[in-house]
Curated annotation (Swiss-Prot):
The gene is PCK1. The keyword Nucleotide-binding applies. Keywords: ATP-binding, Decarboxylase, Gluconeogenesis, Lyase, Nucleotide-binding. The keyword Phosphoprotein does not apply. Its EC number is 4.1.1.49. One of its GO terms (molecular function) is ATP binding. It comes from Candida albicans. Residues 1-22 are annotated as: Disordered. The lineage of its organism: Eukaryota, Fungi, Dikarya, Ascomycota, Saccharomycotina. Belongs to the phosphoenolpyruvate carboxykinase (ATP) family. Pfam families: PEPCK_ATP. ATP binds at residues 255-262. InterPro entries: PEP_carboxykinase_ATP (IPR001272), PEP_carboxykinase_C (IPR013035), PEP_carboxykinase_N (IPR008210), PEPCK_ATP_CS (IPR015994). Pathway: Carbohydrate biosynthesis; gluconeogenesis. This is Phosphoenolpyruvate carboxykinase (ATP). One of its GO terms (cellular component) is cytosol.
């Protein structure tokens, strides 16, 4: 049989989806010549072939594509910029999170990215959706020069059917990823050779100076944090979500990177809805993504079997260390970065619910990873406490989640997602307050951090995953509602005195502390003061009840 031949936007003799026609709208829009090969919506085997041509890319012993993201192995939040333009400027929460960049600077960066992409012999284009609910989903197009980036976004977004691709049309949002090429440091507003810029008027994003794939994922998340509340009055959440198999009960886990969202939501006894990004509309909760982006440091089949078994053909391993001959990954090796990751389609998780659209009203878990060791492993929250701790967004920034973060340290991230917020945090907090008031759902503060002592003092340890899972099981079964509770001083949080499968001494931080009473009191008062200082930013817009729900500083 003769090999297939190239016809317009069909396939070339190698069997790869390509575009060669000068009449193709994409070719015309990018001003490409016919010598440029465009892999348009290429399947994983094709992207593997192209990816293996990239320096340092290979296949793991389990079949995953292993790639390196260059000098940047985490997000660069200090280089994130929003274009200051007339249609969106009045809504933006300007400041350290959303840095302003002028329209002229945007045009220079966009032209720079496109000029770089035009020099490539081969480009990759991915068309996909963000948002599982058809009422709210947006069409996304990624144009990039690395097969690794194309496969990453193919995994992370919602993959259209063949029929949907035929009728895809023009995207609602486009990403130009020219991350191998630096930004112009002499342009107004630039502070480094890295720039991640979003233009809400043009609905486009430009990436320069970083090859870290997570910038694309979080760029789309930022867009949803803007579009959903403004256009649809839908709440966007930095959370994971799962659903009980028998009862159908839905759980939301709020938290920053490294606090346990992905790990805790991947539960064999529950259906996975998503591990990181969700929206909550009047229809219920829906996942924004079509994949999972799991941390891999110290990953094992025993501790996290569903994630471990998802690292197979079609998945991407990012910045991991492996044996040169056998290609077996050493998940305990952090010599490249603490932020080793794996990206895979959500349906690689056997317990995933497809489509990712639960309908029951969820109960909430506000996840924190407390590096001071003074917060309880689990606390039941009042509605006012939910508001206070959601606005505060306290956790410890985990090693490797951002450039330069090498050990855990205390941080406050409004709404547990401050790096991705576009509007003022109180706007999201008010949306959550409305949901709480409407549904009267249960809420818990779950601490996956240190027990017995602070990281700085030593002598403590991170709460074992098996105990955190036992606490969750007790909540889901209703067992934790039957036990007695006691109030922990200063933070005035109610903690259980017992929990099936969990040693009682680790439930109350005052009893678990190993460094003496004076040391504990000093540590908890120090943390309470940090809470109070942080909340001053939002106090003028908070109710008296919410302000009173904070710790006694």
């Amino acid at each position: 049989m003769a090999p297939p031949t190239a016809v317009g936007s069909s396939i070339n003799f190698e069997g790869h989806p390509t575009i060669k026609s000068t009449q193709d709208p994409l070719v015309q829009k990018l001003s490409l010549n016919t010598d440029t090969v465009i892999r348009h919506n290429a399947p994983p085997p094709t992207l593997y072939e192209d990816g293996l041509l990239e320096k340092g890319t290979t296949i793991s012993s389990t079949g995953a594509l292993m790639a390196y993201s260059g000098n940047k192995t985490g997000r660069s939040p200090k280089d994130k910029r929003i274009v200051d333009e007339s249609t969106s400027s009045h809504n933006i929460w300007w400041g350290p999170v959303n840095k302003q960049v002028g329209e002229l600077t945007w045009e220079i960066s966009r032209s720079r990215a496109l000029d770089y992409l035009r020099t490539r012999e081969k480009l990759f284009v991915v068309d996909a959706y963000a948002g599982w609910d058809p009422s709210y989903r947006i069409k996304v197009r990624i144009i990039c020069a690395r097969a690794y980036h194309a496969l990453f976004m193919t995994n992370m977004l919602i993959r259209p059917t063949e029929e949907e691709l035929k009728n895809f049309g023009e995207p609602d949002f486009t990403i130009y990823n020219a991350g191998q090429f630096p930004a112009n440091i002499h342009t107004k507003g630039m502070t480094s050779a890295t720039s991640v810029e979003i233009n809400f008027k043009d609905m486009e994003m430009v990436i320069l100076g970083t090859e870290y794939a997570g910038e694309m994922k979080k760029g789309i998340f930022t867009v949803m944090f803007y579009l959903m509340p403004i256009k649809h009055k839908v709440l966007t959440l930095h959370s994971s979500c799962n659903q009980g198999v028998e009862k159908g009960d839905v759980t939301l886990f709020f938290g920053l990177s490294g606090t346990g969202k992905t790990t805790l939501s991947a539960d064999p006894q529950r259906k996975l809805i998503g591990d990181d990004e969700h929206c909550w509309s009047d229809n219920g909760v829906f996942n924004i993504e079509g994949g999972c982006y799991a941390k891999c440091l110290d990953l094992s089949a025993e501790k996290e079997p569903e994630i471990f078994n998802s690292i197979k053909f079609g998945a991407i391993l990012e910045n991991v260390v492996y044996x040169x001959i056998t290609k077996v990954v050493d998940y305990g090796d952090s010599s490249i970065t603490e932020n080793t990751r794996c990206a895979y389609p959500i349906d690689f998780i056997p317990s995933a619910k497809i489509p990712c659209l639960p309908t029951p009203i969820p109960q909430y878990y506000l996840l924190t990873c407390d590096a001071s060791g003074v917060l309880a492993t689990v606390s039941k929250l009042t509605n006012a406490q939910v508001m206070y701790h959601f606005i505060s967004g306290y956790t410890s920034k985990m090693a490797g989640s951002e450039e330069g973060v090498t050990e855990p340290h205390a941080t406050f991230s409004a709404c547990f997602g401050q790096p991705f917020l576009v509007l003022h945090p109180m706007k999201y907090a008010q949306q959550l307050a409305d949901k709480i008031s409407e549904h009267n759902a249960n809420a818990w503060l779950l601490n996956t951090g240190w027990v017995g002592s602070s990281v700085a003092q030593g002598g403590g340890k991170r709460c074992p995953l098996k105990y955190t899972r036992a606490i969750l099981d007790a909540i889901h079964s209703g067992e934790l509602s039957k036990v007695e509770y006691e109030k922990v001083p200063v933070f005035n949080l109610n903690v259980p005195t017992s929990c099936p499968g969990v040693p009682s001494e680790i439930l109350n931080p005052t009893k678990a502390w190993t460094q003496g009473t004076d040391s504990f009191n000093k540590e908890i008062k120090s943390l309470a003061t940090k809470f109070a200082e942080n909340f001053k930013t939002y106090a003028d817009q908070a109710t008296a009840e919410v302000k009173a729900a904070g710790p006694e500083a």
